[in-house]
């Protein structure tokens, strides 16, 4: 069931990589700030592309991110659903849950924090959410980015830096020396092998599998 989604408190920094990690991806020595402006922009693009690939929902105002944010969802209940599929996963704090205007306590709900699934319960029984609005406020995402997510973002950053340093249409290059320096370049015709139409290549996307949301109608 689709909800109305709002970011209440956006992440202070939506980037998955620190500037130190971006410097390392660029092969710079620690403390070398000569390319910080370029790398900060790269980090923002990489994080945004990973959020898109992972189908992270946004509110149309703030940049979607896997970093920790406080959000609010309103579900218009039909009186026949026993499970709410929250838009964000990896939930660290469930702040407020109301059903048809009545606030629930912790014992009234059961949360799968990693999957972002919320049930209405009474003891050991699962209940159906009553007709009307169900409002859920919670904090989801990472304060500290997991190492595997950092690794995938670093791989994508290195790929982007490598692509920027060469012409992707060049198939091969040869240099002849004897008289005058002669350079010959062969170009790909048609699609470039290994290229991808999406923002994240398949091998990196595979590393992100546990962070990809499943779209719910």
Report the location of each language-model feature.
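Divalent metal-cofactor coordination and adjacent catalytic microenvironments
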Residues: 1-217
């Amino acid at each position: 069931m689709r909800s109305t989604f709002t970011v209440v408190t956006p992440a202070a920094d939506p980037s998955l990589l620190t500037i130190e990690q971006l410097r390392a991806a660029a092969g710079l020595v620690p403390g070398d700030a000569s390319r910080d402006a370029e790398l900060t922009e790269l980090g923002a693009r990489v994080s945004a592309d990973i959020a898109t690939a992972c189908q992270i929902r946004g509110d149309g105002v703030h940049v979607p991110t896997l970093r920790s944010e406080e959000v609010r969802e309103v579900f218009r209940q039909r009186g026949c659903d026993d499970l709410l599929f929250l838009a964000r996963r990896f939930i660290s704090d469930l702040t407020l849950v109301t059903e048809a205007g009545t606030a629930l306590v912790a014992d009234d709900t059961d949360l799968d924090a990693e999957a972002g699934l919320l049930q209405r319960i009474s003891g050991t029984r699962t209940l159906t959410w009553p007709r009307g609005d169900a409002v859920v406020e919670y904090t989801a995402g990472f304060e500290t980015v997991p190492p595997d997510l950092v690794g995938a973002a670093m791989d994508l950053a290195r790929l982007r830096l490598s692509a920027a340093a060469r012409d992707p249409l060049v198939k091969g290059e040869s240099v002849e020396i004897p008289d005058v320096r002669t350079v010959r370049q062969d170009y790909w015709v048609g699609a470039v092998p290994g290229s991808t139409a999406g923002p994240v290549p398949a091998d990196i996307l595979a590393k992100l599998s546990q962070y990809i949301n499943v779209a719910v109608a």
